[in-house]
């Protein structure tokens, strides 16, 4: 006889009827699974004095091991079994306690922020919770939710169930609304039905005492020691609270540059990048993983060759930074020179820093002037040779990322208020940034203070004229001896990404888009006001432009379920129509919110204020990819232009397509805008390898689920170009290539096509060998946790 050790330590005979109740519920109404098969295979592993916990884990593992291409529903069996166990751990029974009890318990344990639940009718909201929606999770989805998002106590025991999580997030984000119960319910409905999902930081931290809700930050380093080290401090603080970072180093003077009038005194950007690398390692993200920092450099910078080699395993280790993610800020002129097989001139930004402030024709004019200037430092390289080096590194290591400076800035709705200097870690965010500005603070012996620009000429009482940054305590100005001269900073701009994604596998009709997009735009706008900001500059920037990034996920599932082949004419037309609707309703909602809550501060003189939308600045070649003409749009764009001019816009930036790997796993759909990896693969988890089958795989969808490696990479680029027409920011776009199909010409054609079609960036180049192990494990180690 087999005996069982209960949770309370009591030993009693195994009661198979109790197990049968759970196995029956776990297999009910699921095709291709068998209650008896589950019980028989699990019982083979039972032993005397087995614990109830071990029985539960054995049942779950038995179901997980049965997940396969022809039996994908075992994933839902495993999920249900996991949920039954979770209910008992959290509630003490198979079900949900009252919402009020959940809040009181979580507050008592210090895991939920006190003070916002009082703004709501807890009886009403408790009555709206739908526990049955838990059964939407497949096994990997519920495991991901448990491991990354559900709240736990100090001993790592779960204290939260999925629907309570969704409701408390909804409440937190609706707390300042005029009708908080109504808006919270709208947020809950969309999130809990998996129609859309917030990015990882919002899901994990909304409702908690550490409500850092933003995914990524983008900043810029000035060319002085004070500014460089202030940047490290800022990166450290941002990383501490779990933010992914994109940082522009293009202003930092190159190797061989001048320092204090001495030529060849500068060691260039690389030593400073090594320190940034150490910041990423030292300031791990809440103790869970090392920081993630992408560093950007303009392609005309003299240090570009070393920058490309930043992560190489060979060479001088003092010039390597293996934990950074290098990205190149590529201008049109460089790629024109590549196509012309012409020479490319590299400059020192110390002598031509205005190039970082210019793009398009203004940049080209100034660049040509610098080329003709005999007085400044220059280096020359054949543009095609530099391009080959970039592409070779891209193929070998997937890096450096490529981002196209002119494409990004041409379509910047806030070009009147600054310039886009780089993207973020995942290359989908494009917003204005600016480095700190430094000036001289002169403190006199009488305690008074005066300020000067660094290079401002000042005449001392000794009749000596010098730059303000050369003043010392030996100088006297207007009869007042100087006590000390110090450099102080005026904050620049560090951009913020607040992200969420529409699930196209569920939301793909005009009616549903019209219903869901306004809810998610409002939710993201509320994130801005309720966010915890690591420093003042970040908050000021976010409140200045009120940037959000609404994206999409589940495109491959949506196409398969509509029996549309990837890269086909129908594919391009379908996503064109969907993205138009999403863009239209996102802009419309922001205009409505502007009337309700006020416009963003930089609205005046923006492209929005002139009625100029992303589609109005779309790339001409991209427009030719679908047959929709200029006057053949489904939406009333002219009416919306007039509305925006009258109302204003609540948000300076609206749309961006992020990677979504975690949240797409959570809701059981395909990742972001990408084709599938394989029909079946394995995800690595704390529990081991978990088999995963693409969603809703059946005879109707089988032929329409095509591996990314079996799709022409140019079709990925063309699909991205169609989406980009409607997006004011960018897309996190991976390119997939089989090794046997790779060549210099292939890579050249792919990435020049991306540039020509108006894309703003590409993310990783993922290559795969022709022989793939049957137990293919998807490598997510290189992915940004925060944009997921």
From Swiss-Prot:
Catalytic activity field: a 2'-deoxyribonucleoside 5'-diphosphate + [thioredoxin]-disulfide + H2O = a ribonucleoside 5'-diphosphate + [thioredoxin]-dithiol
Pfam families: ATP-cone (PF03477), Ribonuc_red_lgC (PF02867), Ribonuc_red_lgN (PF00317)
One annotated GO molecular function: ribonucleoside-diphosphate reductase activity, thioredoxin disulfide as acceptor
Record-annotated site: Interacts with thioredoxin/glutaredoxin: 784, 787
Keyword Nucleus: no
Chain positions of site Important for electron transfer: 763-764
Coiled coil segments of this chain: none
GO-annotated cellular components: ribonucleoside-diphosphate reductase complex
Entry binding sites for ATP: 6, 12-18, 52
Top-level taxon of origin: Bacteria
Ligand binding (GDP): 200, 424, 428, 661-663
Record-level GO BP terms: deoxyribonucleotide biosynthetic process
Keyword Nucleotidyltransferase: no
Positions contributing to dTTP binding: 223-225, 253
InterPro entries: ATP-cone_dom, NrdE_NrdA_C, RNR_lg_C, RNR_lsu_N, RNR_R1-su_N, Rrm1
Cysteines engaged in disulfide bonds, as pairs: 216-497
Key words of the record: Allosteric enzyme, ATP-binding, Deoxyribonucleotide synthesis, Disulfide bond, Nucleotide-binding, Oxidoreductase
Residues of the active site: 424, 426, 428
Domain ATP-cone as annotated: residue spans: 2-92
The family this protein is said to belong to: Belongs to the ribonucleoside diphosphate reductase large chain family.
Subunit structure: Tetramer of two alpha and two beta subunits.
Chain's role: Provides the precursors necessary for DNA synthesis. Catalyzes the biosynthesis of deoxyribonucleotides from the corresponding ribonucleotides.
Protein name, entry field: Ribonucleoside-diphosphate reductase subunit alpha
Gene: nrdA
């Amino acid at each position: 006889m087999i005996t069982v050790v209960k949770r309370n330590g009591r030993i009693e005979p195994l009661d198979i009827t109790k197990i049968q109740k759970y196995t029956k519920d776990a297999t009910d109404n699921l095709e291709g699974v068998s209650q008896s098969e589950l019980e028989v295979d699990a019982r083979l592993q039972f032993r005397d004095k087995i614990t109830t916990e071990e029985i539960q884990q054995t049942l779950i593992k038995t179901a997980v091991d049965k997940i396969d291409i022809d039996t994908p529903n075992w994933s839902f069996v495993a999920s249900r079994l996991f949920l039954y166990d979770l209910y008992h751990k959290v509630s003490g029974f198979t079900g949900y306690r009252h919402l009020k009890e959940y809040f009181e318990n979580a507050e008592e344990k210090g895991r939920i922020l006190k003070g916002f639940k009082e703004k709501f009718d807890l009886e009403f909201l408790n009555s709206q919770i739908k526990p049955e929606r838990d059964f939407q999770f497949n096994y990997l989805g519920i495991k991901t939710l448990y491991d990354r998002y559900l709240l736990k106590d100090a001993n790592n025991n779960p204290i939260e169930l999925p629907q309570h999580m969704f409701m408390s997030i909804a409440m937190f984000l609706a707390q300042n609304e005029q009708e908080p119960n109504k808006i919270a319910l709208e947020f809950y409905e969309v999130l809990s039905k998996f129609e859309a999902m917030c990015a990882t930081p919002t899901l994990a931290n909304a409702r908690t005492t550490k409500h850092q809700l933003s995914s990524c930050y983008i900043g810029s380093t000035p060319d002085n020691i004070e500014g460089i080290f202030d940047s490290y401090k800022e990166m450290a603080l941002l990383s501490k609270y779990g933010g992914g970072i994109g940082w522009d180093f293009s202003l930092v003077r190159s190797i061989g540059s001048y320092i204090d009038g001495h030529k060849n005194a500068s060691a260039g950007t690389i030593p400073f990048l090594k320190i940034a690398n150490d910041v990423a390692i030292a300031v791990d993200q809440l103790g869970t993983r090392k920081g993630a920092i992408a560093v950007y450099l303009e392609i005309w910078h003299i240090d570009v060759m070393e920058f490309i080699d930043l992560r190489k395993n060979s060479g001088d280790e003092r010039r390597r930074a293996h934990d950074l993610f290098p990205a190149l800020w590529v201008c049109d002129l460089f790629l024109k020179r590549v196509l012309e097989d012409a020479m490319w001139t590299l400059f020192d930004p110390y002598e031509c820093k205005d190039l970082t402030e210019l793009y398009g024709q203004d940049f080209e004019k100034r660049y040509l002037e610098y080329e003709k200037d005999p007085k400044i430092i220059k280096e020359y390289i054949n543009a095609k040779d530099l391009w080959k080096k970039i592409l070779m590194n891209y193929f070998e290591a997937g890096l450096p990322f490529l981002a196209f400076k002119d494409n990004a800035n041409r379509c910047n709705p806030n070009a009147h208020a600054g310039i886009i200097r780089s993207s973020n870690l995942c290359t989908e965010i494009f917003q204005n940034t600016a480095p700190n500005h430094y000036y001289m603070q002169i403190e006199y012996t009488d305690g008074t203070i005066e300020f000067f620009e660094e290079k401002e000429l000042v005449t001392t009482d000794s009749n000596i004229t010098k730059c303000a940054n050369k003043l010392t305590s030996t100088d006297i100005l207007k009869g007042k001896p100087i006590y000390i001269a110090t450099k102080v900073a005026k904050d620049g701009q560090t951009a913020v990404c607040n992200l969420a994604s529409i699930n196209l596998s569920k939301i793909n009709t005009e009616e549903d888009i019209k219903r869901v997009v306004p809810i998610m735009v409002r939710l993201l706008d509320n994130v801005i006001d309720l966010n915890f900001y690591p420093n003042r500059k970040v908050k000021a920037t976010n409140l200045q432009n009120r940037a959000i990034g609404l994206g999409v996920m589940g495109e491959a599932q949506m196409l398969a379920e509509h029996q549309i082949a990837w890269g086909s004419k129908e594919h391009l037309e379908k996503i064109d129509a969907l993205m138009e609707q999403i863009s239209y309703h996102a802009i419309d909602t922001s205009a409505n919110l502007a009337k309700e809550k006020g416009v963003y501060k930089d609205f005046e003189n923006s492209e929005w204020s002139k009625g100029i939308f992303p589609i109005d600045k779309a790339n001409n070649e991209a427009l030719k990819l679908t047959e929709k003409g200029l006057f053949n749009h489904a939406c009333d764009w002219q009416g919306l232009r007039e509305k925006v001019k009258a109302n204003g816009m609540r948000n300076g930036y609206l749309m961006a397509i992020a990677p979504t790997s975690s949240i797409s796993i959570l809701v059981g759909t395909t990742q972001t805008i990408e084709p599938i990896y394989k029909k079946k693969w394995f995800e690595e988890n704390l529990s081991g390898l978990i088999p995963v089958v693409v969603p809703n795989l059946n005879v109707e969808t089988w032929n329409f689920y095509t591996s990314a490696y079996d799709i022409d990479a140019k079709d990925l680029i063309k699909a991205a170009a169609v989406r980009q027409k409607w997006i004011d920011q960018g897309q996190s776009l991976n390119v997939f290539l089989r090794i046997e199909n790779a060549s210099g010409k292939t890579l050249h054609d792919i990435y020049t096509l991306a540039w020509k079609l108006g894309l703003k960036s590409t993310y990783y180049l993922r290559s795969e060998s022709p022989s793939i192990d049957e137990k293919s494990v998807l490598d997510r180690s290189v992915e940004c946790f925060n944009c997921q």
